[in-house]
UniProtKB/Swiss-Prot annotation:
Chain residue ranges for the region called Leucine repeat I (LRI): 313-377
Lineage of the species this protein comes from: Eukaryota, Viridiplantae, Streptophyta, Embryophyta, Tracheophyta
Protein encoded by which gene: SCL31
One CC-aspect GO term: nucleus
Keyword tags: Coiled coil, Nucleus, Transcription, Transcription regulation
Residue numbers spanned by region PFYRE: 519-614
Short sequence motif named VHIID, residue ranges: 427-431
Function: Probable transcription factor involved in plant development.
Coiled-coil segments: 233-266
Protein known as: Scarecrow-like protein 31
Listed GO MF terms: transcription cis-regulatory region binding
Domain of life: Eukaryota
Ranges annotated as biased composition (Low complexity): 113-136
Region (Disordered): 105-136, 234-260
Family label: Belongs to the GRAS family.
Length: 695
């Protein structure tokens, strides 16, 4: 296409426009030869003609609001040939009037097959002196296209005053009037082509109800349009120009208000969800327990017995043999065993099938990802997903309804902290691994009633930085939510966020410990993620972490650990221990939750599946799941300078009564051993909690 266009188009003067094409997102190359700013003429393309010396720059918000329309127009310009279809520059009013004229010509004169060239009256002004052929020349539009049916007599003469179009290129040597009339009025075939062109052009345009963008359904309005003849419609449009702008402003304001209402409604639902899951009822019981699915465990057992038993598969033996083959480097045998496991396992089957599915994934990743690329890419894809607190809370609520583990861990920790701070005026809690802060709403609720003399609650939340440009975003959001709860219950609050990858390297001044405050250190189920000693290091990071807590000299130190022994350096031993541990967890869910529960599927995949992948497929510093038994941690803590507070037998008995009241499964185990509060499933201890003070 020629780069230099000059001439007259529809009465518009665009000499004031800039000489570069805006980037509309369709890859249109910039050019200084022509510029069609269609967004400036969207509201009234054939009504307002600016002065020649007027420089117009539309507001940025107006351009943004019509960005979708610009994309449609730009796509049309990219796909159509401007040299072959010159009428693309004409406005909709001229097109509509041309249609009416064609209908009248066809109906009045069937004998007249073409319009003589000499019956067309043209008048041009400034034919040669107003334009130049340079690449920086502007296009001056001085044409007025008017159709008045009363001028169409028997002769069918049409008058186009001042109508030289795009003159200046060699291929546009004839006046635009003659080209237009010959192509449109030559014979009846041209009429059919014209209608066919309309049908083709309509494919590029959106539906009628899509011209109002980003409006909610309740905000849509039906605007009646009355078609008038001649200049009356144009005059009415010009008269109501400001009224339409005011109406559009009202629509935009109403849309903003509706969005604010929607956001407030979502916040209200999210707050209600947090309250239901994290707060206590009038009897100091978790509200989520009442609506949980644990009460249906008996029905699930009966339903399972009623079904016809499927052929039993010994997944444990198959998985163990496959792990031994992987460890020995026997890829052929391992692949054969994996195929047998894949035929029977399923992420939505029973407990053993789900367990086999995730362990088979981990074994396959270890077998195929000898260089670590496949393993780490999978692990990063899971860990780097940005999961909102609401998404985690849904899965967390299912875990609470299925098992009492987290509820009793929080109850134990909160009671020990409240006992230590019963007369405190300022309580400072340092929470290692605060994450979303699910532990603290119920604590704040109870603190507001048990200690009316408390002047301030301070919480220092410590967490591993998340991926991205804002590593502290998650823990800052946690602080904001806790602030809202403190305002709600009337507890003065101060929050401090620390993001650190290696917790043993945090400086003492970062905790902002002040004199005359009760200091409580809390670490719930995060010891398993601490780095262990690796070859080449003299000091163990786990011992360094405990030494840091001892240097803080807390009034009370609460620790809850995952009781597992799959931190061994030997793969086969680690695999067997992990298989025993996660078999109990999957069996727990199978006995208390239905197979089709979507939150159960999400929780098993996002948490247990990721942990299994890390334990089995990763090695070295990439393996971050390294749990130890509670007796191993007891030795470490005593060596670090702590002494253990005894667990009251009355407290364990109270927890047993609570668990029976809440309707949990009878196979859950609560016990006390060596001043540790233990929880498990069917005799296997899974979690342990204890309270420590400096010796």
């Amino acid at each position: 296409m020629e780069s230099n266009y000059s001439g007259v188009v529809n009465g518009y003067d665009v000499s004031f426009l800039p000489t570069s094409i805006p980037d509309l997102g369709f890859g249109v190359p910039s050019s200084s030869d022509f510029d069609l700013r269609m967004d400036q003429y969207y509201h009234q393309p054939s009504i307002w003609v600016p002065d020649q010396d007027h420089h117009f720059s539309p507001p940025a918000d107006e351009i943004d609001s019509e960005n979708t329309l610009l994309k449609y127009v730009n796509q049309l310009l990219m796909e159509e040939s401007l040299a072959e279809k010159q009428s693309i520059f004409y406005d909709s009013l001229a097109l509509r009037q041309t249609e009416e004229m064609l209908q009248q010509v066809i109906s009045d004169s069937q004998t007249q097959s073409s319009i003589p060239n000499n019956s067309i009256t043209t008048s041009s002004s400034s034919n040669s002196g107003d334009y130049s052929n340079s690449s920086n020349s502007s296009v001056r539009i001085e044409n007025e296209v008017l159709f008045d049916n009363k001028h169409l007599g028997d002769s069918g003469v049409v008058s186009f005053p001042g109508s030289n179009m795009l003159r200046g290129g060699e291929q546009f040597g004839q006046p635009a009037n003659e080209i237009l009339v010959r192509s449109m009025f030559s014979d009846a075939e041209s009429v059919l082509q014209f209608k066919r062109g309309l049908e083709e052009a309509s494919k590029f345009l959106p539906n009628t109800d899509q011209w109002i963008f980003n409006l909610e359904p309740e905000m849509e309005r039906v605007v009646p349009v009355k078609v008038e003849e001649g200049w009356s419609a144009i005059s009415k449009t010009r008269k109501n120009h400001h009224e339409r702008e005011e109406e559009e402003d009202d629509l935009e304001e109403a849309r903003r208000r509706s969005k604010q209402f929607a956001v407030n409604e979502e916040d209200g639902k999210l707050t209600e969800m947090f309250d239901k899951v994290l707060l206590l009822d009038g009897e100091c019981d978790p509200q989520i327990i009442e609506d949980g699915e644990n009460g249906s465990s008996k029905a699930l057992v009966k339903k399972g017995r009623a079904k016809k038993k499927s052929r039993a598969v010994d997944f444990r033996t198959l998985l163990t043999l496959c792990a031994q083959s992987v460890s020995a480097g026997d890829k052929i045998t391992a692949d054969d065993l994996l195929r047998q496991i894949r035929k029977q396992c399923s992420p939505v089957g029973d407990a053993s099938q789900r367990l086999a599915h995730f362990f088979a994934n981990a074994l396959e990743a270890r077998l195929e990802g000898s260089t670590g690329t496949m393993i780490q890419s999978y692990y990063d894809s899971i860990s780097s997903k940005k999961r909102t607190a609401a998404q985690i809370l849904k899965s967390y609520s299912v875990f609470l309804s299925a098992s009492p583990f987290m509820t009793l861990i929080y109850f134990f920790s909160n009671k020990m902290i409240l006992d230590a701070a019963k007369d405190a005026s300022v309580l400072h809690i340092v929470d290692f691994g605060i994450l979303y802060g699910f532990q603290w709403p119920m604590f704040i609720q109870h603190l507001s009633k048990s200690n009316p003399g408390l002047r301030k609650l301070r919480i220092t939340g410590i967490e591993i930085p998340q991926h991205g440009l804002r590593p502290t975003e998650r823990i800052q959001d946690t602080g904001r939510r806790l602030t809202e709860y403190c305002k709600r219950f009337g507890v003065p609050f101060e929050y401090n966020a620390i993001a650190s990858k290696n917790w043993e390297t945090i400086k003492m001044e970062e905790f902002k410990i002040r004199p005359n405050e009760v200091l409580a250190v809390n670490a719930v189920l995060r010891f398993k993620n601490l780095r262990d000693v690796i070859p080449g290091e003299e000091d163990c990071p786990r011992d360094g972490f405990l030494k840091l807590i001892r240097d803080m000299n807390p009034n009370v130190f609460l620790s809850s650990t995952v009781n597992g022994s799959f931190n061994a350096p030997f793969f086969t031993t680690r695999f067997k221990e992990a298989l025993f541990h996660y078999s109990a967890l999957f069996d727990l869910f199978g006995a208390t939750l239905s197979k089709e529960n979507p939150e159960r599927i999400h929780f098993e995949g996002e948490f247990y599946g990721r942990e299994v992948m890390n334990v089995i497929a990763c090695e070295g510093v990439d393996r971050v799941e390294r749990p130890e038994t509670y007796k191993q941690w007891q030795v470490r803590m005593i060596r670090a300078g702590f002494k253990q507070k005894p667990v009251e037998a009355e407290l364990v008995q109270l927890f047993r009564e609570k668990m029976k009241k809440w309707g949990y499964h009878k196979d859950f185990v609560l016990d006390e051993d060596s001043n540790w509060f233990l929880q498990g499933w069917k005799g296997r201890i899974l979690f342990s909690s204890s309270c420590w003070v400096p010796s």
